[in-house]
Every structure is written in structure tokens, then in C-alpha cells.
Amino acid sequence: MKKLVTLTLILSSFLVFSQTTKEFVDNVVNEVESNSKLEQLAHELFDVIGPRLVGTPQMKQAHDWAIKKYESWGIEAYNHEWGKWRGWERGVTHVDLIEPRLRTLVGRQLAWSPSTGKKGLQAEVTKIPLVENKDQFSEWLETVKGKFVLVSQKEITGRTDSQWEEYATEESFEKMKKTRDELTDQWYNSLRNTGYGYRDINSAIEDAGAVGLISSRWSKAFGANKVFSAGTEKIPNVDLNLEDYTMLYRLVENNQKPVIKVIATSKEHGDVPTFNTIGMIKGVEKPEEYVMLSAHFDSWDGGQGTTDNGTGSIVMLEAMRILKKLYPNPKRTIMVGHWGSEEQGLNGSRAFVEDYPEIVDNIQALFNQDNGTGRVVDLSGSGFLHSYDY
């Protein structure tokens, strides 16, 4: 039901000559309320297939699944191959604190992380120090050989600001924010002093002989980290939950010389083809003019691939299903694009524009969703002249 407004707005944009607009909207609402397939689509895509990182078997599985869905509804669909990507498959991640005590830590490898192998790696942990210049950082780099390196800032709290505001005194809340801001400024100033950018500092540590990197990019929400790409070529990069990461950080700060064991397996599959999934309902009066539904199909793979952008993907699937059922002979051709590799630079949709100029030149309207969960609170227009008028 959260997607009812979105579906109605999309579907009511199509002029149906045999019905009034109100009749058509009523039929759409009735179909969504009494025969919605959204929950089943969500289960199959999010729970069974899971996240869809470009280049993984799960991404290809999702493309093929979408085609079968469209074909089962009588909708023409195909995979548009637009290029190659690094083939990679996530395996098991297991992290244990060995010294100064035993504890299993909560973590997962970052996307495209090199594998530790089944036996794993065991080593002491160190951290990036605060430095005043590149020479200090270069001197520290000489100490990292054979160690895991903590490469993220230590957070001073794992509670959200809304919880602090609700339960803390005003004085303690303001003190926490001030301390957090000071530590954050200190951290980023030190990173700049190293002479390396955010993207290449990992490579410098790898080249210095570290056995692995330990990251933690907290999203400012309970239990949720941002898990993106490893940024290494030969050594693993593993994300730890905030509480485990900050515990390790404190152990290093207090010279406890913590030791961890990391098993993070993954498979490399070489270069693999990458796709967009395209579906269409042919127009009967102006088939060479197009109305386009759009949502990127890929995701990062640290979560389920649901919010970004599985929700938009199943909305477009459901919209096409309902259109085929209630409006099987549209005036113009209705197309849907499930784009691959949006997260790496809008690659799939850019490739479609390049490969199909005759379609792009004749698009009359395009509806895209990449909003995540929750109710629709804003409709923005862009790209087409006078689009905001609609």
C-alpha cells in the first residue's frame, strides 16, 4: 500500500479512450488493493535473489527473473547487453577477536574485496594515526607490514541524534555534538595532511604491506553501515559494525595490541557481460513514440538491495503488469528500463541512450523512481521542456 500513490500517478498518466480517467484510476486502485503482486515480487527479488551488485551472479539472476515475470504477464522483454564488468561473488565472512580476549565480531567484506582464502588471516591490528604532514604518515606506513589497519574514524556514540535529543540533558547533548565535530575535523584534517585522497589512501596502505583493512562507515542509524567497494587489489577490506570497530580502536589506542582472525572468502569470475532489462507494450496508434518507466536494478550488496533501488524496481514491474491487464493496447509504446550499474556511474542508462537514439529521441514522457521506502512526498520534473507543468 505504500506504493499505491506512485502506481496510481504513473498509471493514470495514460489516456484510455474506452474509459473516463476516473474509471481508469478506480480500476487501478481496485487492482492494487485487491490483487497487488508487490509483496510477492519483493519477496522473490529481495529475499530469494537478494542484493544485485553489478558483475555478480545475483545481478544476472535478477535480470533473468524479471524477463520471466514479464513473459508470464504477456509482456515482451529482453536483456540489453551493454558492456563488461568485473565478475565477483561474495562468500562467507567471519571475524574473531583473538587477543586480548575471545569474541566473535560482526562484519562483512566490502564489494569486490580480495579473498583471504579458506584458512583466513590472523594478525595484530593497528590504526591510521593523526599526522601533521606527509613525512609523518610515510614514517608510519613503514610499521604496517603484516598487520590489519583500521582505516575509518572512531565514532564517539552509536546512538542517533534523535535519541540523544529525547533522553539526554541539553548540556550533555551539546557537549557530545561539540566533541564529535572537533574529532571529525581533526580526523579529516589529518587525512589531508597524509597527502593522499580518500580513494587512494587504501592503496598506499596496501602497498606498504598491510595484510588487510578494517572499515566502518556508520550511517548514523542503529546497526546500519554503508558498505561500498573495497578499494584494494590484493588484500581484503572488511566492514565491522560500529560497536565492534570502536572496541578494536580503543584497544589499539590503549596499546593492548589486539589480534584478530579474518576469514573473508570471495570468487573472481573474470570479465562478465552486463545488462539492462527492457520490457515493452507495443503502441497501436503511434508505436514509434514512447512513454518510459525507469528504475535502476542494481544495488550495493552490503544489505538486501531493497531501499536502493529494489522498491523502485518492483513498482515499475507492478505498473507494467497492471498496464498490460487494464490497458493492453496503448496509443504509444510503453517501455520499462531496469538499468544495470547505476551505482557505479549511471552506466546502464547511459549505454541505453547511446545504443538506442531512435527511441530516446521519441520519448514523450519518462517516469523514474529511486526514492526508497515510505510514502511519496514529492514529484520533481526535469529533462523535458515544460515537464514541471505536468
Question: Each predicted region: which residue ranges?
Answer:
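Bacterial Sec-dependent N-terminal signal peptides
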Residues: 1-21
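Short helix-loop-beta-strand segments that form the rim/entrance of peptidase-like active sites
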Residues: 40, 321-347
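Structural recognition of the beta-strand scaffold that forms the well-ordered cores
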Residues: 41-44, 79, 127, 148-152, ...
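N-terminal capping segment at the start of a domain
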Residues: 22-56, 82, 92, 220-229, ...
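Noncatalytic luminal/extracellular "stalk/propeptide" segments of secretory-pathway proteins
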Residues: 43, 47-181
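Metal-dependent peptidase/peptidase-like ectodomains
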Residues: 102-104, 118, 123, 142, ...
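Active-site-adjacent substrate-binding region
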Residues: 183-195, 199-202, 206-207, 212, ...
